[in-house]
């Protein structure tokens, strides 16, 4: 029998939103196991393997945090699932995927819907996936690559330095900024990043005691959806910088999965949807990826910008 853990050191990045995410996981764990003592470790505490010069949630930053976990600097790591690679480094596994918040994108503006924004409106987007899909939907938009926190981007819109911004609904919700939301963007406009809306708790694969302490907060439906999304990314084989999105949703015992790949300039967007039974997440992800590849995604991946 695996003994019950009494103390757990859990890490996250050090920005405000990451700390809120860590608190969210801590609250769930304390509700499940009130006697579990939890110590927080943050990326700016001078821990080896964490490059604090990089922006929060950047690939190198997340890689540094995962290295810290592999090296045993803490027992578990909380990461927004949208920022994880589809394949984890050797020695790590998913301890839990939390109950998913709204996975969609939202529009922040001064009371204009996306279709109502003036021609050539300036719209902030933090990554190439959002940028490419917005340009595919409205090629006239002037996309500004968003820098800084969600709060700072919202303030730029409110101060009219930007006409609008597209942000993850879950980030806005965690920051309690829902009053600024003008519109939820459907997948016909912008498919979210794989994993968006959930938090992933990573643990070392050989730490049975930690896995036992964490697994109780796993949300099975969210886990299934995200495993399918990651399988889509993995089988698609697109590079890290490619404009790729995926979203799974479960109703009863049916899992619907949709995904897309776009050209960075937004001139092309290849999209497909598949349905299947819960329990066949990897097969569904692979099937969707194959459909997207066969519909033109394979040719798109040969473009110089996506090599």
Where do the PLM segments sit?
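A conserved helix-loop-strand patch within extracytoplasmic ligand-binding domains
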Residues: 90-141
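Small-molecule-sensing regulatory modules
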Residues: 1-59, 71, 81, 136-307
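Short, well-ordered beta-strand segments
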Residues: 9-11, 77, 95, 124, ...
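Glycine/Thr-rich phosphate-binding loops of Rossmann-like dinucleotide-binding domains
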Residues: 87, 133, 175
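Short beta-strand-centered segments that line the small-molecule binding cleft or hinge
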Residues: 62-106, 178
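Alpha-helical segments flanking ligand/cofactor-binding loops in enzyme cores
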Residues: 67, 114, 154-155
